[in-house]
């Protein structure tokens, strides 16, 4: 399935053909924002921590730029990957754990990010992983994985924009679900812990069938 205005052939390439993997990093500043393996969940940055260089863990080495992609090398099936978008206009340095592969591409970063999150790419990653409890892939093996991609920048943009919009809709729906779940928990607590005397179940329910049908529910809520 493709957008109708595009017809050129897709090309086969390895990740290292279209991106720099773990590019040389600048020197760490005295303080920086650190992204560890627990900070990212399904593409979202869930935790931000500012730390001092002398207190930083040894894994804090990858200085990241805007639009750099972080690929989770440990348990990559979780797909906790992240594309970095600068959250402020200051010169604050951002540093990622070496548990991520840092990917800097000249193609559309959003397009490559979505490509790396596909099931097909993930399967190729998993067969190259070592370890059972914590399967992991090293950056050198990740760089050699081959895949088809469109070299057309306009097509890359349209594909990534569509997938971005879908992700935004999913994120919005998930937030609505979280709020409804919180509301349900609050109502349940109020209804079950309101201090009213306990009553027998048979005094408040009328059970006519083990299978609940819509027409069995009375206007009073009994069934």
Annotate each language-model stretch with its function.
Residues 2-25, 193-223:
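Non-catalytic DNA-recognition/assembly elements of restriction-modification systems
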Residues 9, 34, 63, 94, ...:
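Short aromatic/basic micro-patch
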Residues 19, 23-55, 211-223:
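DNA target-recognition patches
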Residues 58-121:
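A short beta-sheet element
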Residues 77, 92-98, 130-154, 211:
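A short glycine-rich beta-alpha junction/loop motif
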Residues 57-58, 131, 153, 164:
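Short, solvent-exposed loop/turn positions at domain surfaces
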Residues 1-13, 146-188, 196-197, 201-202:
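Amphipathic alpha-helical segments
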């Amino acid at each position: 399935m493709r957008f109708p205005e595009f017809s050129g052939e897709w090309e086969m390439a390895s990740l290292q053909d279209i991106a720099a993997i773990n590019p040389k990093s600048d020197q760490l500043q005295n303080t920086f924002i650190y992204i560890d393996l627990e900070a990212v969940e399904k593409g979202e940055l869930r935790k931000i921590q500012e730390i001092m260089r002398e207190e930083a863990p040894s894994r804090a080495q990858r200085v990241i730029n805007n639009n750099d992609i972080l690929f989770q090398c440990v348990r990559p099936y979780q797909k906790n990957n992240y594309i970095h978008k600068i959250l402020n206009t200051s010169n604050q340095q951002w540093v990622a754990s070496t548990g991520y592969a840092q990917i800097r591409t000249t193609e559309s970063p959003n397009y490559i990010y979505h490509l790396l999150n596909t099931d097909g790419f993930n399967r190729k990653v998993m067969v190259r992983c070592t370890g059972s409890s914590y399967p992991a892939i090293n950056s050198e093996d990740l760089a050699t994985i081959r895949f088809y991609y469109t070299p057309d920048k306009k097509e890359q943009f349209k594909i990534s924009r569509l997938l971005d919009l879908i992700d935004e809709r999913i994120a919005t729906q998930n937030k609505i679900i979280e709020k409804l779940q919180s509301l349900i928990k609050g109502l349940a607590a109020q209804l079950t812990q309101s201090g009213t005397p306990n009553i027998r179940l048979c005094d408040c329910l009328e059970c006519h069938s083990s299978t609940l049908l819509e027409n069995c529910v009375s206007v009073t809520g009994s069934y």
